[in-house]
C-alpha cells in the first residue's frame, strides 16, 4: 500500500507486522484445536500469542539470507520461542496457505469493520445536515438543467439512503470474507476437519471449501 494514500487504521491492518501477528494468531488457534482434539497433552500457556515476538524485518532477513521462503522464515523464528514440548506441533500437517489465507480472513474482516466504522460516522453527519437543511431551498436539476425546487435536506437524505444500502452490503461482505481453512495443500485434510472447525470457530471465522488457497471470489 502507498502510505500517503492510506488511512492510518487501514495501513496498520495491512502492515507486514500485522500480517505476521495474524499468522501467530492462526497458528496458536490451530495448536489449541489440536490439543482439544487430544493430539497431544502438553500444556499451552493462556497468553501464548504474547510469548511469540515476530518482527517483519527479521522474517525478511531470514527469508533473504537462509530460507528463501517467507513461511519457513516465520516458522523458524516463531517455533524457537515456544516451549520445547509444543514445537513439534506448531504448524504440524499444515500448508502455508492454511495459515496465510485464514489470517487473510482476519485482515479482510478488520478492513470491512474499519470501512463500516467510517461509513457510520459519515452517515451520522449526513443525517445531521439533512435535518439541519430540511427547509433550505435549492433548485432541482434533471439533465443538468434547472427543474422544480427541492431542499438541500432532501438531497442529503437521498445520499443517506444510498449509504444505508452500502452499510447493508458491508454486513454481507463481512460474513463473506470471514472464512478460514486448514484443509492442507490440496484441500484433502491432512488434519481432522474437526480441527479446522475448532480453529475457525475460535477466530470467529467459518470454514470454507478450498484447494490450496481460498478462492478470491469471496471479496
Kindly label every feature range from the protein language model.
Residues 1-189, 193-201, 207:
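A helix-coil-helix interface module used to build multimeric assemblies
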Amino acid at each position: 500500500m502507498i502510505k500517503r494514500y492510506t488511512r492510518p487504521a487501514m495501513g496498520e491492518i495491512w502492515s507486514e507486522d500485522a500480517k505476521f501477528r495474524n499468522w501467530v494468531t492462526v497458528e496458536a488457534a490451530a495448536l489449541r484445536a489440536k490439543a482439544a482434539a487430544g493430539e497431544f497433552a502438553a500444556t499451552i500457556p493462556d497468553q501464548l500469542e504474547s510469548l511469540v515476538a515476530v518482527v517483519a524485518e527479521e522474517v525478511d532477513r531470514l527469508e533473504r539470507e537462509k530460507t528463501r521462503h517467507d513461511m519457513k522464515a516465520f516458522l523458524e523464528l516463531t517455533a524457537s520461542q515456544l516451549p520445547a514440548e509444543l514445537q513439534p506441533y506448531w504448524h504440524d500437517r499444515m500448508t502455508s496457505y492454511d495459515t496465510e489465507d485464514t489470517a487473510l480472513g482476519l485482515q479482510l474482516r478488520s478492513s470491512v469493520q474499519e470501512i463500516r466504522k467510517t461509513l457510520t460516522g459519515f452517515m451520522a453527519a449526513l443525517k445531521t445536515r439533512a435535518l439541519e437543511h430540511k427547509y433550505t431551498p435549492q433548485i432541482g436539476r434533471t439533465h443538468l438543467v434547472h427543474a422544480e425546487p427541492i431542499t438541500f435536506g432532501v438531497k442529503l437524505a437521498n445520499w443517506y439512503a444510498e449509504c444505508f444500502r452500502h452499510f447493508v452490503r458491508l454486513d454481507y461482505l463481512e460474513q463473506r470474507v470471514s472464512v478460514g481453512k486448514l484443509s492442507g495443500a490440496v484441500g484433502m485434510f491432512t488434519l481432522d476437519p474437526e480441527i479446522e472447525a475448532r480453529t475457525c470457530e475460535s477466530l470467529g471465522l467459518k470454514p470454507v471449501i478450498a484447494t490450496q488457497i481460498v478462492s478470491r471470489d469471496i471479496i
